Amino acid sequence: MITNDKFQFVIHRDNFLSESQCIKLIKYFESKESKDSELAGTYDKNLLNKEVRNTRELVIDEEKLTNKLKMVFELANISTYNYDIKEMEEVKLLKYTQGGRYKWHTDCGAKEISTRKLSAIVQLSDENSYEGGDLEFGITNETGESNYTTTRIRGSIIIFPAFLSHRITPITNGIRYSLITWMNGDTWK
C-alpha cells in the first residue's frame, strides 16, 4: 500500500524574504490602488462579505519573486506532499487593518479554486507591529497541538495543503501585511 503520512503537514521556513524585501513590498502595496478582497470558490452571490473576509489586496507581478515562490513550492512538494502540481496562480499582497480578518476557510473548493493543491503565505509585517491577526490551523499538527498558531516572523513562509482549514484572527491593533499564492494541479484523484 502506498502511503503519505505527511500529506497534511504545515511547513514553516524563516528568512524566505529579507526584512528589506518585505518593507519594499509593503511600500509597493501602499503606492498602488488596492481593492477589497472577495470570497472565492463559492456559489454565494455576495462575494464581498466583510463579516467573513475583511482585507485589501493587490496583485503583484514580479518575476524574481514568482520564480522563488515556484521553487519553494516544488521543493516542499518533493520533500513532503508528493501532489500533482503544475502551475502557480497570481501572487497577491494583502493588508489587514483593525477589524480585518478571514474566518475559518479552506483555499480549495468549487469553481475557480477547485484545482488548488498547495497554499503559501509570506509574513511581511514585523511581528510586533500589530495585535491579533494570527494565522491558525484547525488541525492537529505532528506534535498533537490543535488549532495551532503559526510563526509571525517577518519574511517567513508557510506552505500547506489548500484543503486545510485555517483563519486569520481579527486584527485588534496595527496593520498586518502578507503575501499569498497557490499551486494548482490536475483534479484530485
Residue locations for each model-derived region?
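Non-heme Fe(II)/2-oxoglutarate
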Residues: 1-85, 101
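Catalytic core of non-heme Fe(II) oxygenases with the double-stranded beta-helix
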Residues: 70, 74-189
